[in-house]
Amino acid sequence: NRIMLQEEKVANGARWLLWGWLIVVLVLNVVPLGDELNQDLTTIRFVFRLDYVLHSLSFLVFALIWVLGKIKGVCWFETYEVLKFGGIVFVSAICIELLQIFIPYRTFNPMDMIANLFGALLTMICIVISHRLPRLHR
């Protein structure tokens, strides 16, 4: 019984980590952060800014949360676990950037959305791979 309580605490902690990180990403995307992250990592034909990398990485963190949860035996959802978790990540990647259309001091940038979606895609790849690895399942 004590082991079950401990496992439930770990599972709840992992779920809080998922939703907590989602809130952090949301806040970082609606709070004015200044122009320091808009540094160019430029080639001659294409402007590539540092914040594009940060957008992708912020969504790639969800892959780490998934894997850590799975290592601890967390069942994220009763059914369609991979699909639901990935759906949350993809919908968040789109909606968080679209939200900036309605915030007066922020600007919607389709390249930011592409960077978000790239991070979400990498997350889905990691989730699918880890889901197929038997050592992560108890």
Region locations from a protein language model:
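Bulky hydrophobic segments
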Residues: 2-111, 117-138
